Amino acid sequence: MSPTYLPIFKPPISINLKHKRPKKRTIGRRELVDFPELELFEIEAKIDTGAYTSALHCTDIREERLDDGALVIRCRFMDESHPNYNGKAFEFREFALRDIKNSFGEVERRFVITTTLRIFNEEITTEFSLSNRGSLKFPILIGRKILRDRFLIDVKKKNLSFKEKRRMRRLVKKKSQ
């Protein structure tokens, strides 16, 4: 009887690849953020890990059909009582209509747009739902979708991005003198 040869099992080569993740920035429970495309600057935003989608306060939200048949939404950001209100109407040709849970757990149908948020001098293009937040303290809500893999929240602090922005302005001003 001839001997039976079994193949030698070779375990797969283990390669320890450490993915270089960008360092997460620490932000506070509130931050002053910019929306350059919407001409809104230093708007106070609430950081909310309980919310998945971020929200922007706007008024006069309406869907309209143009002469060419295209659907658009038009709105104004903030409201007349807000110091950053500029009264300018914005039009968006690219948008979605989604069901989003509000802070009371009720599902609301909201328009969602893509725009650029600037925080810590980093521009993040992301989605925001449009909502009338006039009765709420903060006109902007930053949810987990933006926070994930980018930021850590220190609830004892606030406006860390703005403080860094102000410090950088002072440095530039000193250098130019």
Model features per residue range: what roles?
Residues 2-177:
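Pepsin/retropepsin-fold aspartyl endopeptidases
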